[in-house]
């Protein structure tokens, strides 16, 4: 029998989204515009919350960190994707692929914990308004933010440690535009059933249960709001529905990707583009357009910067 060559694969190839160069260029223009909008929109939220003292509260501190995370999450895959759209040879080295998997799961895992902390913050604000200031004092929400980043790091370390021992010695083509961990695992030239089962239980079931838990938490909050009245109720209702929409946009693709056997389906690329390219752009739109405080703060910031710009050019 011929001996199997266990030499590690040096690089992976990405399949083309389309064979038309004109369509690839069109997609480049569209996704480049989306990426710029993502960075600028989330950066605007970060600057507004930082410069506007009225927004120096736990909820907006968490939102600012969420915006930073959205920029990071999008930047892990989209710039490489844009370069590949203009390239004839769409490849990524083995080391860069492992790094992309690490940072992708780092940001994705941290995002899940951030959304959970934001739900906890809204629960305390509505269920325990008299104790909210003491229960969500600065030391507490800073610790929660740090814990979210650390948890994301631990999650990504586990993903990469599990994959590193597997040899890649043959097929090296991914039907994706980034190192999609489920497809990378399938390319290993050894039995990956145990790893696939662990990832489905670790990523899939945990993500599904977490999603249902967050939806349940916001449902409880919305029920509590029925006993409130006036402007405060409308403000809290708008905030919670925005959070629920963002949670849904984040978790539904994750549930689709991880709560099933490792196989390639026709919708995978569309779901991945929605998750990595579109959703990070939608988050600042959802949070700003549905939040009157945020819109007012942006207007005040614009007026504050306006006169200085006029003097600069006058």
UniProtKB/Swiss-Prot annotation:
Q: Which InterPro entries match?
A: GPCR_Rhodpsn, GPCR_Rhodpsn_7TM, Olfact_rcpt, Olfactory_Receptors
Indicate where this protein resides in the cell: Cell membrane
GO cellular component, as recorded? plasma membrane
Please provide, alphabetically and separated by semicolons, the GO molecular function terms listed in this UniProt record. G protein-coupled receptor activity; olfactory receptor activity
- List all disulphide bridges recorded for this chain: 97-189
TM helices/strands, residue ranges: 26-49, 58-79, 101-120, 140-158, 196-219, 236-258, 270-289
The residues that the database entry marks as glycosylated are 5
- Membrane disposition: Multi-pass membrane protein
Which loops or segments lie on the Cytoplasmic side of the membrane, by the record? 50-57, 121-139, 220-235, 290-314
Extracellular topology ranges: 1-25, 80-100, 159-195, 259-269
Entry keyword set: Cell membrane, Disulfide bond, G-protein coupled receptor, Glycoprotein, Membrane, Olfaction, Receptor, Sensory transduction, Transducer, Transmembrane, Transmembrane helix
Query: Which family does the entry's similarity section mention?
Result: Belongs to the G-protein coupled receptor 1 family.
Q: What is this protein's function?
A: Odorant receptor.
Know the name of this protein? Olfactory receptor 4D6
Gene designation per UniProt: OR4D6
